[in-house]
Amino acid sequence: MKHLTPANAKAKQFTEAAAEGRQDEVVAMNSMVGCTTSFDPGWEIDAFGDSMMVGAVPALKYYFPGIQIDARSNRHWSDGEAAVERAGDTLRRAVVLSFGTNAGIDEATVTAVLDRIGPDRMVVLVTIHIDEPRTRADNTLLRRVAKERANVEVADWDAAVRSRPDQLQPDGIHPSLDGAHLYASTIRAA
C-alpha cells in the first residue's frame, strides 16, 4: 500500500470531495491554498451520454461538483430521449447531451429530446469525434439544430480533441485520463 504524504493526502481528500459533489468542502480547501477559482454549480446540471461521457465522469464531477450523470456505453440518441423522458420535470436548470458515437445522429430524435427539455433550460450538445465519414455531417447537424434554439450551445469536443490526439485512448475515440479533463473543460467552455 502506498503511503500518503500530507500533501498527497490533501490532494486525495480534495479529489474525493470534488468527485462526490461536496461543494462546501471543495471551496474551503481551495480557499486554504489561496485558490479563488469557482466551478459552475454542478447541482444545477443533468448530463446524459454514451461511452464518451462514461470515460469523463471523474473529470465532470471535478469541474461540476454535484452534477447528476446518466451515462452508459453503447447508447444512442433514442436512449437519450428515453432518459430525458424518465427524468421528466425533475430535470435541472442545465442539461448536457452527448450521444451519437455509436449509431449516428438523427435530427428528428435530437429535436424530440430538445422539445422535451423545453426552452427554459440551458442545453449543451457535445459534438462527436470518430474516424468515420458521417462525423462531419453529424456535427454539422448538431450545430445547425443549436443555432435554431436560443437555449442551446455546442461543446465542440471534435475540434478540441482533433488538435490534441494525445488526449485519446489508443482506440482514437475515447478520452484518456487527461482527455477526460479536456472533454469536461470543453463542455464548461460552451
Regions found by a protein language model. Give the residues of each.
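N-terminal secretory targeting modules
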Residues: 1-46
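Conserved SGNH/GDSL esterase-like catalytic core that processes O-acyl groups on lipids
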Residues: 38-112, 130-137
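Hydrophobic/aromatic beta-strand patches that form the interior of the parallel beta-sheet core
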Residues: 46-48, 124, 153-155
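A generic structural signal for well-ordered alpha-helical segments
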Residues: 60, 117, 145-147
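A broadly tuned preference for mixed-charge, low-complexity surface segments
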Residues: 93-116, 148-152, 174-186
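A short helix->loop->beta-strand "cap" motif at the edges of active sites that frequently abuts
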Residues: 119-122
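Catalytic His-Asp segment of secreted/periplasmic serine-dependent ester chemistry enzymes
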Residues: 135-190
